[in-house]
Amino acid sequence: MNRDTLKQIMIDQKDIYLNNPLITRQYFLETNVNYCFVGIRRTGKSYMMYQQIKQLEADGIPLSQIIYVNFEDERLLEMTAEDLNLILEIGLEISETDIKPYLFLDEIQNINGWEKFVRRIADMKYRINITGSNSKMLSSEIASTLGGRFVIMNIYPYSFSEYLIANNMTKNYLDVISTKDRADVQNQYNKYVTYGDTEEDKQEIAAIDHI
């Protein structure tokens, strides 16, 4: 993997989590824990990472100390496990500090042999979060694969209450009493069961509504 190409990809991808609108999910997360976010595609695993990054930023961690790589990027198709350490090297170069950066590796299962890398980085006391959605990542064996170094967090599609919050309806839908509010909730429920209940589905619905 060409080092300069990888560095450019990392810089490009920073805009993804900086500019993506964030809807906080109803999961309790700690910033001093290594997480492995698993779940079917389109349930918002990446957004859990964005949520973690926003919390670190709120806690005063400079963005230069945050490394985010999404391995769905087609420019990374030829990347191998041997190249993964370049991510850490480039991250340390960008941060211009000896302080260990936080790593967020999205859909890392796309790289064969990724397991040894993340175990080694965790053993070196880096804070690292990963996501995955293939059959191996979703299996009960993932905990043993990661050797107890990560908390496995299963991410599920939106509940209906989360879906309402994502669509700017902050009222408790169980307490809705006016005719208009009932109609609004029914309209959202129809979309929820028709189009889907994931973060990406919510964005697609918003796009449809603006057509």
Tell what function each PLM region has:
Residues N2-K14, E141-I211:
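Interdomain motor-coupling "hinge/lid" segment immediately C-terminal to the ATP-binding subdomain
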Residues Q13-N32:
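Pre-Walker A adenine-sensing motif
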Residues F37:
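Hydrophobic anchor at the beta1->P-loop junction of P-loop NTPases
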Residues R41-R42:
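Walker A (P-loop) phosphate-binding loop of P-loop NTPases
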Residues K45-S46:
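Conserved lysine of the Walker
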Residues I67-P101:
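Short glycine-rich substrate-engagement loop in P-loop NTPases that contacts/grips substrate
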Residues R127-S133, N154, Y163:
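Structural recognition of the conserved hydrophobic beta-strand(s) that form the central parallel beta-sheet
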